[in-house]
Structure formats: C-alpha cells, structure tokens
Amino acid sequence: MYPAHLLVLLAVCVSLLGASAIPPLPLNLVQFTYLIQCANKGSRPSYHYADYGCYCGAGGSGTPVDELDRCCKIHDDCYGEAEKMGCYPKLTMYNYYCGTEGPYCNTKTDCQRYVCACDLKAAKCFARSPYNNKNYNIDTSKRCK
C-alpha cells in the first residue's frame, strides 16, 4: 500500500474514533420543531423557543418566568415521566400529521404515543401563550433561582 493511502486511512480512522465520542443530537427535535410550526401556523420560528426563560432550551431550574416558560417546564416534566416509563424521549421518533385543525399524533408504541403527546401538548401551549421578547436569552443565574 502506498504511504499516501495509509495516511488517508489513518485520518479516516482517527476521525471516526473522535466522532464516536460526540453525543448524538436528539432525534425527535426536528419532529418537535414541525409540531410547533404546525400549532402556531408558522407565526414564530421554532428556534425562538430554544433559549427562552428558565426552562425553554437545555436544562431548567427555578420558577418559570411566564406562561410560555411554564409550557417548557411542563414539557420537561413530561419527558421526565417518559424516562420513568423506560422511554428515551429525546431519541423516540413518532408519527404525526399537521391537519387543518393543527397537529395530531398517530403512533404505535406506548413510548411513541407518550412522547408525541408531550410534544403535542407543549406545541399547543406555545401557540396559545404570549411571547415576551424580554424573556429571550435571559441571565438564568440571576432570574432562575
């Protein structure tokens, strides 16, 4: 084998080893994003909910800052219950549809049904809750105690 081929092979192997240490992204995040867009009829981009208040986004602590943030806390709690059932909510894929009346779930397994219900409830809650720009990207160390 040529030395250049060995270097390429070595580089591929090293990159694969490094990639195996990277945690996977939540698989149902895209589905949740579409449920949100369906529920709010596209009135606000889904990423606006990724860093809102004390609970929308990664983690969560303290008292929710408003109704929308309470939706995220309820969603977090729902995922916690799903985990107690032995489900992996961030990795669970499910079937859903966006109909004229909004999104709805159409899934087969208990975990799929439960996780889809969590996401559906949150998406509908987001759609009916006011969005306060002042609660986007807040200093959680000060406001979420």
Curated annotation (Swiss-Prot):
Propeptide: 22-27
Subcellular location as annotated: Secreted
Tissue and organ distribution: Expressed by the venom gland.
GO biological process: arachidonate secretion; lipid catabolic process; phospholipid metabolic process
Major enzyme class: hydrolase
GO cellular component, one term: extracellular region
Enzyme Commission numbers on file: 3.1.1.4
Keyword Lipid metabolism listed: yes
Cofactor note: Binds 1 Ca(2+) ion.
Coiled-coil annotated spans: none
Highest taxon, organism lineage: Eukaryota
Positions annotated to bind Ca(2+): Y55, G57, G59, D76
Cofactor(s) of this protein: Ca(2+)
Major place of residence: secreted
Active site: H75, D119
Sample GO molecular function, one term: calcium ion binding
Family: Belongs to the phospholipase A2 family. Group I subfamily. D49 sub-subfamily.
Name under which the protein is recorded: Basic phospholipase A2 GL1-1
